[in-house]
Amino acid sequence: GLTRPSKRCLAGSAPCEFHRGYTCCSGHCLIWVCA
């Protein structure tokens, strides 16, 4: 239940700023949760 990786991000940082509900996983923004 993941979308394709989006904007780059830092692991352990706040949720991705460009959209709510995104989480940082493996250096990329993923919707909702990590796989």
Curated annotation (Swiss-Prot):
A cellular-component GO term for this protein: extracellular region
GO MF term list: ion channel regulator activity; toxin activity
Source superkingdom: Eukaryota
Keywords: Cleavage on pair of basic residues, Disulfide bond, Ion channel impairing toxin, Knottin, Neurotoxin, Secreted, Toxin
Subcellular location: Secreted
Keyword flag Secreted: yes
Propiece residues: 1-8
Tissue: Expressed by the venom duct.
The keyword Disulfide bond is annotated on this UniProt entry: yes
Disulfide bond residue pairs: 9-25, 16-29, 24-34
Known role: Probable neurotoxin with unknown target. Possibly targets ion channels.
Family the entry assigns: Belongs to the conotoxin O1 superfamily.
Domain note: The presence of a 'disulfide through disulfide knot' structurally defines this protein as a knottin.
Protein name: Conotoxin Cal6.1d
